Each structure stands twice: as C-alpha cells, then as structure tokens.
A protein has these predicted regions:
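Low-complexity intrinsically disordered segments
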Residues: 1-5, 11, 71, 96
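Structured soluble/peripheral alpha/beta segments that form catalytic or ligand/cofactor-binding pockets
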Residues: 4, 84-415
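Short, low-complexity, intrinsically disordered N-terminal modules
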Residues: 4-8, 26-27, 49
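Intrinsically disordered, low-complexity repeat segments enriched in small/polar residues
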Residues: 5-17, 77
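Short, low-complexity intrinsically disordered segments enriched in A/P/G/S/L with frequent Arg
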Residues: 11, 17-23, 35-41, 46, ...
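Hydrophobic helical h-region of N-terminal Sec-dependent signal peptides
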Residues: 72-76
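C-terminal motif of bacterial Sec signal peptides marking the signal peptidase cleavage site
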Residues: 80-82
Length: 415
C-alpha cells in the first residue's frame, strides 16, 4: 500500500562518512543487478532541492533545501581540507517562521548565469535517457560540484553513472580536482579531470568516460528554463540563500560507448543549476523526483525531511507542453513508496517504487526503478552514499494512458 506524504515519519540509518581526502583522480564501482523483492516496509520521506510552496517566497529556516543541506555541505568541507561533518545530535538555531523572501539581490540572467559564480556552493546536474540506433537503452547521470572558500583554491568534485538496461548493471565513477574553471562571455565550460561540460543558452554538451562506458553528448533545451520559486531565488534562513533553475526537457544526440562499442544515441535529458552562499545545516535528507512524460509535460517533486524524520517542506512544479509552470504545494500532490530495497553495499534501506498523484492535473503515476541497485557510494568525493536511479513511468491523465521516464534521488538513508 502506498503511503502519502501526510506527516509520515520514516527511518534513516547513519553511517560513517568514509575517508576525508582524495588526491585528484577517479574511483568507481560497477555492479550487476541484484535487486531484492519490493516490500511494504516503512518509508521515510526526504527532500532534495526544496523551493517554496508559497508563490511570494519563503524561508526554510534551519532546513536548507536539498543538496545544500547535506551533500554539498560535506563535499565542500572535504574540498577545503576538512571533514566538516557535524557531530551527532548537533543543532542549529531555529529560524523564524516562514515569511515572504526579500527581493532577490539581482534577477537570474540567462545565458550569463549558466557560467560559474564566486559563491560558496554551486553545482550543474544532468540526468537523461538514451536509446541507440539498435534500440538499446541507457540512463546517465553527470554532475559537477564547485566549492569556493576565500583564498583557498576552487574545489571540484564530479559523479558519472550509467544504467545499462541490457546488462542489468549500474556503473559509476567519482572524481575530485582543483582544475581552474574555464568560461567565456555568456557561457560555461568546466572540467573535472578529463570530464567536461559546458553550454551557451539552450545548447549544452557533456563528455565523460569511466570503466566500460563513455558519453559524448550534445543537448538542446526545447522549453524555457524553470525559475524555481518564481524568481529562481530561495532563502534558507540562517543557512544562506540560493539561486536555482532547471531545464526540464533537453533533446540529446551524440555517441555512447559501452564495453568498447560506440553507437549513436538520441534521447531526453534534465538539467539543474544551483548556486549561492549556503552552507551546512545538520541532519535530514531529501527525495527528489523528475518525470518527463510522453505527452510533452514534466513533473518535479521535492520532499525535505528534518533530522528526526519529519517532513519539513514540500515543493513541486508541473510544466505543460508550452513550458508554462504551475507551482505545486503540499496539498496539490500525493507521493508514497510501494516497496523498499536494502543495499548490500551501505546497509541502508531505501524506498523502491512510488505512486505519484497530482489531483489538479488529473495525473496518477507509478514509478518503478529500472534497477533496484542504483546506489552511489561516493564517500571518497562527497562524503555520502545516495541512491540516484532511472525509473520507468506509467499512469493516466483523466483516465487516458500515460507513459514516460524519470530519475529519483534519495539521500539521508545512508551516510
């Protein structure tokens, strides 16, 4: 039975963060599918990049949304030479009740803001779904993180993962580097080791290679960027503030190499870019869902959980065929897990399989992982283990059949 978000509290396992340093280089993992049967175990809701459920802005208080709260905090501490993780049970001061956010310091300006900034924390995140000319299917994730700390060198980390439908396997790599960023007017070009990404306006490119897999992709956005919280600016109270936008539908073309064989691929991708002067907020985690439906619409849902396991914030966006955005509040959506999966690598138990319902849009969806095991154990670069996996989507809109693809990110279950 699916459990909805209403005041649901779940379990999270705290585990060691692993080594606190890694010289420039790469480590990775590759595993065959070893999924366990879905169970109806308890499910703790988390959230990732929380934005406002109030159209005029808000403050999340001590619950800095999503990656700023946990992943980036640990990462950035690592990149400047310390372990930086908070002691168990440590607390931050509670911020005032949510209030309308002040006017942003400046508006998001694109394409100029595609490039790197001098803020404390920043990342560029891509996931996508690829199909070869012979009909084979693959999912991919490529994400670059940047940390800026005063006079310290700029620090970078990156993750690259491939979900191979044919082999039933999931492979990932991680890197850290202090490569100087390279960028030009109105564009960005970044490198972490020999992995690169960049873009200008609606056109982007990605290049990465790992053990057994490589991608050389060009992406073109077919819809305007989604500026979250209306203006693309979020307040996290005492934890700082952040700019955040997404490109929810990008057409992909290029070459994928799998086990020494190169093939042309096409597909769809999703891009997130977030930056700001946000820093550590202790505990909790997030679940983030991105769905690209076959009718040309997209759905994003974020659930944020505090350290005790309570739902601290809920946010969503629905993007129609023309790129018009409807902000979704907690009362506008229902999401819950249909099963669970226990990782043989970290020992964490993750939700596995979901029901997502948007009553206002008449949408009811089922999300099923392509593979149960899509966990990244990135303790040597970002200090955490997390589940970032490709999902297959089916459902209905007003009774008519729907299908699509998506990605789900789960953090806070294992650290």
């Amino acid at each position: 039975m699916s459990k909805t978000i209403t005041l649901t509290q779940g379990k999270r396992e705290n585990r060691g963060a692993g080594p606190c340093a890694l010289p420039p280089g790469r480590v990775g993992g590759s595993r065959e599918a070893a999924g366990s049967p879905a169970g109806a175990g308890s499910y703790g809701f988390l959230a990732r990049r929380a934005s406002s459920s109030q159209p005029d802005g808000f403050s999340l208080g001590r619950f800095a949304g999503g990656r700023p709260a946990l992943l980036l905090a640990i990462l950035l501490a690592l990149l400047v030479g310390g372990c930086g993780a908070p002691a168990a049970g440590s607390k931050l001061e509670m911020a005032p009740a949510p209030t309308p956010a002040p006017v942003p310091p400046r508006p998001v300006v694109l394409p100029a803001d595609e490039a790197a900034h001098d803020n404390l924390s920043e990342w560029w995140y891509y996931t996508g779904h690829l199909r070869t000319e012979s009909g084979e299917k693959y999912g991919f994730e490529l994400v670059f993180f940047q940390g800026v700390r005063g006079q310290n060198p700029v620090g970078y980390a990156a993750h690259f993962a491939i979900t191979d439908h044919q082999q039933g396997s999931f492979s990932y790599e991680e890197k850290v580097d202090r490569t100087l960023r390279v960028q030009g007017e109105g564009q960005y070009r970044l490198a972490v080791g020999d992995w690169t990404m960049g873009g200008q306006g609606d056109d982007h490119y990605l290049r990465a290679q790992g053990k057994g897999y490589a991608v050389d992709l060009k992406l073109h956005a077919t819809k305007p960027p989604v500026l979250h919280n209306g203006a693309g600016w979020l307040s996290f109270g005492p934890a700082g503030d952040s700019y955040y936008y997404s490109r929810t539908r990008m057409e992909v073309g290029g070459v994928l190499q799998a086990n020494g064989v190169s093939e042309r691929v096409t597909g769809l991708a999703w891009m997130d870019h977030q930056w700001g002067d946000f820093i550590l907020v202790n505990g909790g985690g997030w679940d983030w869902y991105s769905v690209q439906l076959g009718d040309g619409t997209e759905v994003m849902v974020t659930l944020l959980r505090d350290q005790p396991g309570n739902v601290a914030a809920v946010y969503g966006s629905y993007v129609d065929r023309q790129g018009r955005v409807t902000e979704l509040k907690a009362g506008d959506l229902e999401v819950g897990a249909t099963g669970s999966w226990r990782s043989p690598h970290s020992g964490a138990t993750y939700p596995s399989g979901w029901k997502l319902r948007l009553p206002g849009q008449g949408i009811e969806l089922t999300l099923e992982p392509v593979l149960r095991d899509q966990e990244l154990n990135t303790t040597r670069s970002t200090g955490v283990s997390y589940w970032e996996g490709e999902v297959q989507v089916s459902g209905t809109r007003g009774g008519a059949s729907l299908s699509g693809e998506g990605y789900v990110e789960l953090t806070g279950y294992a650290r």
